[in-house]
From Swiss-Prot:
Putative iron transporter. Disruption phenotype: Attemps to generate a knockout failed. It is found in: Mitochondrion membrane. This is Putative mitoferrin. Induction: Expression is modulated by the levels of iron ions in the environment. InterPro entries: Mitochondrial_sb/sol_carrier, Mt_carrier_dom_sf. The lineage of its organism: Eukaryota, Sar, Alveolata, Apicomplexa, Aconoidasida.
Length: 1199
């Protein structure tokens, strides 16, 4: 089909009780005005966005990982704001006002889980919500964020946080234990005040320090702060050159011998000797070039790249070097850096001064444009080399992380390797949880697990960190097999002096289970507290611990399943064992080593107060280093580390991140335990505190339900449950944008399809397939026709959809960006969103336009093509247009009847039909003498005596018939010539056919006129039979297009020549009289509607069901298009929510980040939600538009 739609094909269908006319593409001619398209499109867009807005909100949540992570920042800010002794409130009033205001603003969105790690994660900009509250903690967070990015191009963001941190003063105390910290809370004499950058007393650090350098070598605020502090010192800064060098790159000026291994150019092909020894690996292809460059850069006591290249003032710097080495420059730099970075240090047990380790990263040198003249050939090469060095440092950390997690050195992680833990199908030692009768409780959280491999080696238990996890899981497994809970047993607790009653009860419970309430002990009992030394940082590098303790290759596993087993067991202990006294029933089949493993748990629990609980308080103190760490201890359940446990680690557990250096960009989620610098401590520390929270009895009634391990689904359900209005946030912005967008969308679509329809060569909607030709007589053949819709022209549909989508997205893209940011809580309301235009400009609202077009263009094309195809199928097969096979027997009967009646025709009628008439060029008929003689014979015959009239009356009748036929003939020919349906070659054929048809029709009209007073029905049958014969003979030599044209012309002539008071039965079709389309010289011809009664479906004949087809077909098209374009929609949503304040984005980098961070499945996040959104949205939009347009056409546009 060369048309763009199938709507024109349905003009040949008439529905009873409802004038349901499908509009033809080529028949607009002002039929539907422009304002009606705009009005209908506006109503359709409003209906779509308002009713579907809740589903769109949920889709946005699913595609952005479902929720805003890290709610502990809220708890942190809440704790600080509720603390009356807050150090910032007393010393800085501006902080008080800012923090209070920002906290209230963010707390309004708390129900929506509005906080995300960083909404501008692509650039780590400082205008995100994360930088607007909890000043010091936020600045520490930003420092950590800058130190954990893939490249050092984000490191310039460290300057502003350090500047903010330098404005505050903190109170510190030198305590030896936790009790001193609590006792000193009321002792103001022991408080010591110092600046945040001042140097606290600390133990000697053996790790070398490398400092952060700005990417473009701009003057770093942090370096300025240090240089200004030392500017008056005669030993440090004797000349202005030293000050300038310090401002440029202070750590290069302090180029000590111990730090040479941290220099990028020096360590181009070697590992750090303190970590990996002297093992060398080549990273550069051309080693001679890099060595040549080192000779230029690394001369003896050369301190800055600028001085080295310029070869100036080297002697002056050398004279000042020794004095500068012996003074405080390098030491102060070390102290400042590690005193500002929060880091876990489990080694400190309270007997030494508080120390905070630091993050070690490599410096980055950038060659300026002015240096390219000397090193024009190699400047770009060395730039890339610097990036490789930075990536290599990250790779070293990944290698250490891999050893810590997987206990292997050379083998990569196999993605689909079977888990070590598997469910035991047939378990002999069954366990029961229930009442005294032993009735088994279904749906319990206890599950039977066993180890697939025997990974326990008690002699080398300390040498393998993984065995700690395995032993804990075996403990869980064996206790589940040996404990039978009996709630009927009484609780025996005689120790009333101990405050920690629940802990004592639990220990006694385990003692009863392990030793049957006896006092004997096992000699070879291993204390789990000794293994905690593996989690501590030592004075030397932690790589040393990993290389010495992680030598055994343990099989790979999934940490997610391991910890799920452990957490399930802990929940059982909380819900069953602690709340009910337990009687020990020892199974004689239990092996001896199982008792030993149970003893591990007992040892661990017995040393609970002495080890884990104390470390909890100390780590909190070391994390903050300030006085307000005490409220964390008092209000422990508001603590970040205890109240928020991240168990959603499945994005990393089965992925090999060490195959390529470019995998370093997955470390955007810096608070994730895998990516956090203290991961070696925090991953175990978190779960141990998880264990302690369940066992500890403090605030039992208030905090028994505080364990909130939130997931994406729980978050969305909590949003709906807490406040349904959250699903409609931002709907006012969408209403203002969807009305003009959809009005232009539908108007552009309608007029573009009208334009392309005129360019097609064939505008006919229906074609008649020539099938089943049967013989009526020896000379006449009758053709049975099969109606069928032409095929769709998908190219024209695609072009129309493309133009409409382009206009639509230019308007809706900025609205969609603002809408999604309001949905996620990034902006509070529409006014707050509009304020961003002043800061970022309107260009920031169109960042996602390319990806939006890339998504919407294929979506709209697929949806429109599917919609048109479904409507074609609906009206072809359901409505019976293509069911001619069912009519076969009826047509044969009609043809036989016509054949019999033909033989019985009157001879006079045959003579009249054989007469010929001449037609001139203008279409007028000429009478010859032979015709006049025949008329005289007919007039004088006895058979026509009753119908004889005067010659004048006959002349008047003939003249009227000739005028009517001539005018009708000219109108038809002029109409089809004006429409340019056929080529010029076809015009002559059509005119000849019309002349023949008009000649035969004139003869029949003469018969009807002469015999008007005769009430003989056979005359009418004869006339009909003659017309049928001519139609059959005519259709044999015609193609499908001319057949349709001939059929329409015949119907028109039948109406003009027949009486208006009766209908003519023609081939079993009911031809209904319509108003004349030729009035007032209007050539917009409305062809008559045909409905086949034998194939009419009563159900689909109802107007409501036909209107429903609009919605059903559009909904099917929207669902198919939604699934196919969902990956592009995910990318669009990420760009709109995460790259708002950037000047641009790299499409392939964003796609690679999503893939390597979350896997291929992340591209299909929210597919079901998007289908649930797009199916009703498309149905409502297109169904409403088509229904409204049809309403206007029937009621306002008909004449």
């Amino acid at each position: 089909m060369n048309e763009l739609s199938v709507n024109d094909a349905f003009d040949d269908i008439e529905i009873e009780s409802f004038d349901f006319i499908w509009e033809e593409w080529e028949e607009y001619k002002g039929d539907v005005p422009l304002w009606q398209h705009i009005f209908c499109g506006s109503i359709a867009g409003l209906m779509e966005h308002v009713f579907m807005y809740p589903l769109d909100t949920l889709k946005t949540y699913f595609q952005t990982n479902g929720h805003m992570k890290y709610n502990m920042i809220y708890d942190n800010c809440n704790t600080i704001n509720n603390n009356n002794n807050n150090i910032y409130r007393g010393n800085n009033s501006s902080y008080k006002n800012t923090c209070d205001k920002n906290y209230k603003d963010m707390n309004n969105h708390r129900n929506m889980q509005t906080f995300k790690r960083n909404f501008c994660s692509s650039t780590n900009c400082d205008k995100c919500i994360i930088n607007n509250f909890c000043k010091y903690k936020t600045n520490c967070y930003n420092v950590m964020a800058a130190l954990h990015t893939k490249n050092n191009r984000y490191i310039h963001n460290i300057a502003e946080p350090l500047k903010n941190m330098a404005n505050y003063k903190i109170n510190t105390t030198n305590n030896n234990n936790v009790n001193n910290i609590i006792n000193n809370n009321n002792n103001n004499n022991k408080k010591k005040s110092r600046n945040i950058f001042s140097y606290p007393s600390h133990t000697k650090q053996y790790r070398n320090v490398t400092y952060v350098v700005n990417k473009k070598m701009q003057q770093n605020l942090f370096n300025n702060y240090i240089s200004n502090k030392c500017i008056n010192d005669p030993f440090c800064c004797r000349t202005k050159t030293n000050v300038l060098n310090m401002k440029k790159d202070i750590h290069k000026f302090c180029h000590l011998s111990k730090e040479k291994y941290n220099n990028v150019f020096y360590q181009n092909d070697t590992y750090h000797p303190n970590i990996y020894g002297r093992k060398r690996k080549t990273l550069c292809r051309n080693k001679n070039n890099i060595n040549l460059f080192k000779n230029h850069v690394h001369k003896k006591y050369c301190h800055s790249l600028d001085d080295q290249i310029c070869h100036s003032k080297i002697k002056e710097d050398m004279r000042n070097l020794q004095n500068f080495k012996n003074y405080t420059c390098a030491k102060n730099m070390k102290r400042h850096l590690y005193s500002t970075v929060p880091f876990f240090n489990l080694k400190n047990k309270g007997n030494k001064n508080i120390t905070l380790p630091y993050k070690e990263i490599r410096s980055k040198y950038i060659l300026k444009n002015g240096y390219k003249s000397m090193y024009q050939r190699n400047a770009g090469y060395y730039k890339n080399l610097i990036k490789m060095q930075s990536a290599k440092k990250n790779r070293h950390q990944l290698l250490a992380l891999r050893k810590c997690l997987m206990s292997e050195k050379k083998y990569t992680i196999i993605k689909n390797e079977p888990f070590i833990i598997r469910k035991k199908k047939n378990m002999r030692n069954e366990y029961f949880i229930g009442n005294m009768k032993g009735r088994c409780i279904i749906n319990t959280s206890l599950n039977s697990y066993t180890l697939k491999r025997n990974c326990l080696d008690y002699h080398h238990f300390v040498n393998n960190l993984k065995n700690i996890c395995y032993s804990i899981m075996n403990i869980c497994y064996n206790i589940k097999n040996t404990i039978l809970i009996n709630p009927s047993l009484p609780i025996n607790n005689n120790n009333n002096n101990n405050n920690n009653t629940k802990m004592d009860t639990f220990i006694k419970l385990i003692n009863k289970c392990l030793y049957n309430n006896n006092a004997h002990k096992i000699d070879h009992k291993i204390l789990l507290s000794n293994y905690l030394n593996l989690f501590k940082h030592t004075n030397y590098s932690y790589y040393y611990i990993l290389n010495n303790f992680l030598k055994n290759n343990a099989p790979c596993t999934s940490r997610k399943n391991e910890w799920n087993i452990f957490s399930n067991f802990i929940n059982v202990l909380k819900n069953k064992i602690i709340t009910n006294n337990v009687d020990y029933i020892r199974n004689p089949n239990v092996r001896r080593n199982q008792i030993l493993r149970n003893n591990y748990l007992y040892s661990f629990l017995r040393n609970y107060n002495k080890n884990l609980k104390r470390n909890t308080h100390m780590i909190l103190n070391k994390l903050t280093s300030f006085k307000y760490s005490i409220p964390y201890i008092k209000n422990k359940y508001s603590n970040v580390l205890i109240n928020n446990i991240n168990t959603n680690n499945n994005t990393y557990s089965n992925r090999n991140v060490l195959n390529s250096i470019r995998y370093n960009n997955i470390y955007k989620n810096i608070m994730h335990p895998i990516f956090f610098p203290g991961y070696y401590n925090t991953i175990h520390f978190r779960y141990y505190n998880y264990f302690s929270r369940i066992i500890d009895d403090k605030d039992k009634g208030k905090n028994k339900n505080i364990i909130n391990i939130s997931t994406k689904r729980n978050n969305c359900s909590s949003i709906i449950r807490n406040n349904l209005s959250n699903l409609y946030k931002g709907v006012n912005v969408v209403v203002l944008g969807c009305i003009p967008a959809h009005a232009l969308y539908f108007s552009t679509f309608e007029y573009s399809k009208k334009y392309f329809s005129r360019m097609t060569s064939n505008n006919s909607s229906l074609k008649m397939n020539n099938r089943n030709i049967s013989t009526v007589s020896n000379d006449i053949k009758s053709e049975k026709s099969n109606f069928k819709l032409y095929d769709l022209n998908y190219f024209s549909i695609a072009v129309s959809g493309f133009l409409a989508t382009l206009v639509h997205d230019l308007i809706i893209t900025p609205i969609d960006t603002l809408k999604q940011r309001i949905q996620l809580g990034i902006n509070k309301n529409s006014k707050d969103s509009l304020k961003l235009l002043k800061q970022n400009g309107i260009r920031s609202l169109y960042l996602s336009l390319p990806i939006t077009l890339l998504m919407n263009i294929p979506y709209q094309i697929i949806m429109i093509c599917t919609n048109e195809k479904m409507k074609k199928i609906y009206f072809e097969y359901i409505c019976g247009l293509n069911t001619q096979n069912n009519k076969k027997n009826m047509e044969n009967k009609v043809i036989d009847k016509v054949h019999d009646e033909t033989r019985n025709q009157d001879n006079i009628g045959k003579d009249i039909k054989n007469d010929t008439y001449n037609m001139d060029k203008n279409g007028t008929f000429l009478r010859n003498q032979e015709m006049i003689n025949k008329e005289n014979r007919i007039y004088n015959s006895g058979a026509l005596e009753k119908h004889v009239t005067s010659q004048e009356k006959e002349d008047k009748i003939l003249q009227s018939v000739k005028q009517e036929n001539v005018s009708s003939n000219n109108d038809i020919v002029n109409f089809y010539e004006g429409q340019s349906i056929y080529n010029n070659d076809a015009h002559n054929i059509i005119r000849d056919d019309i002349n023949k048809m008009t000649h035969k029709n004139l003869e029949n009209n003469i018969d009807n006129t002469i015999n008007s007073n005769e009430s003989d029905v056979n005359r009418i049958d004869n006339m009909t039979n003659d017309m049928n014969k001519e139609c059959d003979i005519f259709s044999i030599n015609k193609n499908n297009n001319s057949t349709v044209l001939y059929d329409q012309i015949m119907k028109r002539l039948e109406m003009n020549s027949s009486n208006k008071n009766f209908s003519l039965n023609f081939h079993d079709k009911i031809i209904r009289q319509e108003s004349s389309p030729f009035e007032k010289e209007n050539y917009n011809m409305n062809l008559k509607n045909i409905w086949i009664d034998n194939y009419k479906n009563d159900f689909f004949n109802k107007p409501f069901n036909h209107i429903t087809s609009y919605f059903v077909c559009a909904g099917i098209g929207g669902g198919i298009a939604a699934v196919l374009t969902n990956p592009l929609d995910v990318i669009k949503t990420r760009i709109q929510t995460e790259c708002f304040q950037t000047k641009g984005f790299n499409f392939f980098r964003i796609v690679s980040n999503i893939y390597y961070r979350e896997g291929m499945r992340s591209f299909f996040k929210g597919s079901l939600a998007r289908m649930a959104l797009c199916i009703p949205a498309s149905a409502v939009s297109w169904g409403t538009y088509e229904t409204m347009k049809r309403f206007f056409k029937i009621n306002f546009n008909t004449t």
